[in-house]
Amino acid sequence: MRYDFVIIGAGPAGEAAAYLARSRGASVAVIDRDLFGGSCPHWGCVPSKSLLNAASLHAAGGDYPWQRASDRRDYMINRVGLDYPDDTGHVRGLRDAGADTFRGVGRLDGPGRVVVRHEAVEHPLEGRHVMLAVGSETKMPPIEGIDGVRTWTNRDATAARELPASLLVLGGGPTGVELAQVYARFGVPVTIVQSGPRLIPTDHPRNSAAALLAMQRDGVDVRLGVRAVRARPAGDPARPDVIELDDGSTAAGHAVLLAVGRTIPLGGLGLETVGLQAGGVPHDGRLRLQDGLYLVGDCAGPELHTHQAHYQGELAVRMALGDDVAPDYRALPRATYTDPELASVGVTLEEAMAAGLDAFEVVADFPTTAKGYSVEAAFGHVTIVVDRGSRHLVGAAMATPDASAAIHECVLAIKARVPVAVLADTIHAFPSTSRILNGLFAEAARSLG
């Protein structure tokens, strides 16, 4: 069978590509070996945010025990009464849009050719454009004996129906801190081991500091600057497994959550049939590996976000169909949904100056603002970075209760290159986090003269 687009992977990037391609009149085949919809709605973004909300209510004294949180989570991921989420809605949506869906392992079989294998049956497909949207997988850290302990991936952590007696989180990125807060707020003793000097190292340093305060407030034992080197299985379900650290100390947990990063599953895709190697497949900056072959989503970089995957899936379709567009990541937002939320976009002051910009930053201490007073905030910040040369915003970060929403004014300002003077002259509702931004824009405008 021949299609305009053959898409391997039905996560956010693959689904977005399929829907847009069908809306443009293209024929589409979508392949996935596991759940249509990908990790986000079933094991990642959706269940974790449901659990974070439940944990927040529980911590505030609401009637929200773990069983209720678990039941709500199962409802959200279509797993009520099941051992595995039901992706029927995702499959139906694609088919209703006119796409053909294939469950099985898809691999390249030469330029423009894909073979789908399912239960020993192979289906050959041809595509004018082939898109690889295979997502990412949990990275197994190089720790001696790790195979012998009770490890969790993010799937296990977001799907658990029983609370562990204790939890050890290896890795202090967004996944690690979000799930640490969930379990800590339900009364589980939690330890985070982070090899670097700060949590969420890809985010703004002030956000990292806020994340540390949030973890400590909720009773999480955070170990920074130490690396796990050896695992000692307990051999008894009632006792925790022990992880030896490179400073001579130990950390323990009845469950050990692996949150040290992600790997890209490019092996087994048949890349060698088109002259490529799985070990290194850089795209051309326009998501193309070669004519007619695109790489989108987590496997394309530069970061790992569902919203980036959605953007790239649609963008690749537009480029394949001849639109004059190219990727633009200047205004790529990042959000971590802890309490408080953490969000950022663009560059830090240090990054701006390293890039040769004549930049400065303006910072508000969130607890001293009207919004901060109203929510009794103990810590947090709102920061903007401005380029004197262009008089534009080039970066922003915040740790506030609604940061994931409030950051988008800055996302739009960076994307559209809105002058700081215009941002300062725009009326913002009081008291809100956006109003704090308004004050920072005004201060920046005065500094610019």
Whereabouts are the PLM-identified features?
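FAD-site-proximal beta/loop scaffold in flavoenzymes
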Residues: 147-162, 251-320
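Beta1-alpha1 glycine-rich phosphate/pyrophosphate-binding loop at the start
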Residues: 3-5, 10-84, 182-202, 405
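Glycine-rich dinucleotide-binding loop and its adjacent helix/turn
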Residues: 45, 133-189, 193, 272-289
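Short hydrophobic core segments
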Residues: 6-8, 106, 124-135, 169-170, ...
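Flexible, glycine-rich terminal cap/loop adjacent to redox cofactors
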Residues: 8-34, 39, 46, 50-57, ...
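A Rossmann-like FAD-binding core segment of flavoenzymes
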Residues: 100-103, 107-118, 186-285, 289, ...
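Rossmann-like dinucleotide-binding cores of NAD(P)H-dependent redox enzymes
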Residues: 77-82, 158-159, 164-168, 174-237, ...
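N-terminal Rossmann-like dinucleotide/flavin-binding domain of flavoprotein oxidoreductases
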Residues: 40-126, 202-226, 349-351, 439
